[in-house]
Amino acid sequence: MRILSFMAMLLWSLCLNAQDSALTSGNFLTDYKRSYLEQELGIPLSTGGNLLLYDTISTWLGTPYRFAGNCEKGIDCSGFVNVLFDRVYGKKLGARNSAVIYVWVLKLNKDELQEGDLVFFRNSRKRISHIGLYLGNNKFVHASTSRGVIISDLNEPYYKRYFAGAGRYKADVIGENNSN
C-alpha cells in the first residue's frame, strides 16, 4: 500500500510539474517531442524546426534501401525525398530520378542551405546519382544504398568528395516540367 501511495504522489507531482511547465512555456508537448526527436535522431533541432519533418524522418530511419522502392519495406533515395515532400510539405516533386530533380531545382551554394533544401551527389562517373534532404548543421537525411534511411553529415569524407550541388524546390519550375 505504501508503494502504491508513493507512486500516486510521484505521478501527481509529475503532472503538476508538467502543468507548470506547460503554463510557462506554452509548448510542453512540442518541447517534449522536440527533445524526444533530438535523442531519436541524434541531432539538435532548432526551435523553429519543422516537427512534422523530423517526426516523419524518425518513422523511416533504418528502412532498408531498395532500388525503385517507395514504401516502409524498402525505399531508394529519390523515393524517400518524394515521400518527405509529399507528407511534410504537401508537394509533389514529379520525378523519381535525382538527376532530373537536380535539373529542376533552384541552384544554391552550400552556405545558402536551409532545412528542407535538397543535396545532390555524383557517382564515380560524374553523374548525379544520389539525393538527400538537408536538415541543418551540415546534416542531411537520405536512403543510403548500404545502410538504408540514415542521417549523415556533409563533412564526412565520402559525401564531401561526391557532393555535386544543392537546390531548393521551386514550384513554378517543377510545375512547368510536370505538365510536359
Residue positions per predicted region:
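Positively charged n-region of N-terminal signal peptides that target proteins for export
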Residues: 1-4
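N-terminal signal peptide c-region/cleavage motif recognized by signal peptidases
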Residues: 13-15
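Aromatic- and glycine-rich peptidoglycan recognition patches
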Residues: 19-45, 107-108, 128-129, 134-180
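Catalytic cysteine-centered active-site loop
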Residues: 40-44, 63-115, 169
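Extracytoplasmic/secreted envelope proteins and their assembly/folding machinery
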Residues: 50-54, 58, 78-82, 113, ...
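Structural motif
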Residues: 116-118, 138
